[in-house]
A protein has these predicted regions:
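Bacterial N-terminal signal peptides
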Residues: 8-16
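Phosphate-group recognition and catalysis centered on beta-loop-alpha active-site segments
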Residues: 19-357
């Protein structure tokens, strides 16, 4: 009898711990501590680590020589000096010159200086977020996925922490069009570094629903893996994902995800969703009248976590219905009930979550 009671108590403790973990709000460092240092630099990742982020994001694209690098766009010209160093290595897309990572070897990409993001206006580079780390200062470079995993795992060993990773497989449709299977390459790299099961501290995210389903239903089983998979959600008008129909690339239509029953369909192949904030709280909301959609409720009813993007405190990035950054966090974490947030300012989000416990 005593033995049985011991087993029951142990089981309750385990269940209690699991429930507590499941109820914890997580902070995902969006491109690292990108509000303070150039996005996706190893320096931004180190800063995010020591700010207490639960997970650190990696956007992953592929090079000409099949290496995986951490870069938000599948082109290089927004965050490096590629235009100056390789002026003729561009493609013209919709009348715009773009220097695609897939057209450069890793050695060539490593020769570039990475910087705070910018746009070119009237022939001049204009920093995207004026109050952030100054463009063109110090030295930063594009890192490989393996370099970043080794950094985070090394810090986990030296600090005794267990900070997770949150890789995004970028534009698999584009890589496939170029003859490369980026999803297999990313998953094999994760497996190499010991990320193989759901209990491991990793989420794999992707905007492409066709590919996300393939990852969950085909690739993970084939590789002997079982990871948490997150379906990112975009507006169809963003042209985030393209699909091949009758030999032509056409925009993928996300509209079904916003219909009643849409979350149940996503839950057939995903463990969570990553929606844009206005998909959860309408922009026309006011402080006295928050217009909250049913997406979080329906996702939770179907056993999925919800991690919206992107929480920023830059000028013009806090919606009018929130007083400040912390009020915005309170609305989403406590009133809407999301399970975590993607933010460029992980220190502020970590402090808020800790103070709320």
């Amino acid at each position: 009898m005593k033995k049985l009671l011991s087993y029951i108590l142990l089981a309750l403790m385990v269940l209690g711990a699991s429930a507590a973990f499941a109820g914890d709000k997580i902070v995902v460092a969006h491109r690292g501590a990108s509000g303070y240092l150039p996005e996706h630099s190893l320096e931004a990742k180190s800063a995010a680590y020591f700010m207490g982020a639960d997970y650190i994001e990696q956007d992953v694209v592929m090079t000409k020589d099949d290496k995986l690098v951490v870069l938000h766009d599948h082109f290089l010209d927004r965050v490096t000096d590629v235009m100056e160093k390789f002026p003729n290595r561009f493609r013209t897309v919709d009348g715009q010159k773009r220097w695609f990572a897939i057209d450069f070897t890793l050695a060539e990409i490593k020769s570039l200086e990475m910087t705070e993001g910018f746009k070119v206006k009237d022939g001049k580079k204009v920093q995207g977020f004026k109050a952030r780390f100054p463009m063109g200062k110090s030295h930063f470079e594009v890192s490989t996925l393996e370099e970043e995993l080794e950094l985070i795992q090394g810090l986990n060993q030296s600090t005794g922490k267990n900070v997770g990773i949150y890789p995004e497989i970028k534009a698999p449709w584009f890589h496939r069009f170029e003859g490369k299977d980026i999803s297999v390459a990313v998953l094999k790299t994760l497996k190499k570094y010991g990320y193989t099961k759901k209990s491991d501290n990793v989420y794999v995210q992707c905007f492409d629903p066709i590919e996300t389903r393939r990852i969950k239903k085909e690739l993970l089983p084939e590789l002997g893996m079982d990871l948490k998979v997150v379906q990112l959600i975009a507006e169809t008008s963003w042209l985030e994902t393209m699909e091949n129909k009758d030999g032509k690339l056409v925009p993928y239509n996300y509209d079904w995800m916003f219909e009643k029953g849409g979350m149940a369909k996503v839950a057939e192949y995903a463990d969570g969703i990553g929606p844009w904030k206005p998909m959860l709280v309408k922009n026309e909301s006011t402080a006295d009248n928050l217009i909250i959609t049913d997406m979080v409720k329906e996702a939770h009813e179907n056993g999925m976590e919800v991690h919206p993007y992107t929480f920023r405190l830059d000028e013009g990035r806090i919606p009018s219905y929130a007083k400040d950054f912390e009020d915005m966090l309170d609305i989403f974490l406590n009133k809407v009930g999301v399970d975590g947030v993607f933010t460029d300012f992980p220190d502020r989000a970590v402090n808020f979550v800790r103070a709320s416990k």
